[in-house]
Curated annotation (Swiss-Prot):
Phosvitin is believed to be of importance in sequestering calcium, iron and other cations for the developing embryo. GO terms for molecular function: nutrient reservoir activity. The keyword S-adenosyl-L-methionine does not apply. This is Phosvitin. It comes from Anas platyrhynchos. Phosvitin, an egg yolk storage protein, is one of the most highly phosphorylated (10%) proteins in nature. Keywords: Phosphoprotein, Storage protein.
Length: 46
């Protein structure tokens, strides 16, 4: 019961929450600087 209720309910919840937050944060954060860096560099170099 413990392995099927406590850890099971906590694992997927934590994984889902962490995955969603990490994916969203990483994607948004990486997308913002990634797109800004190359654009700024290109604009500056050109």
């Amino acid at each position: 019961t413990e392995l099927g209720t406590d850890p099971n309910a906590k694992t997927p919840s934590s994984s889902s929450s962490a995955s969603s937050a990490l994916s969203s944060s990483s994607s948004s954060s990486a997308s913002s600087p990634b797109h800004r860096k190359p654009m700024d560099e290109d604009d500056n170099q050109v």
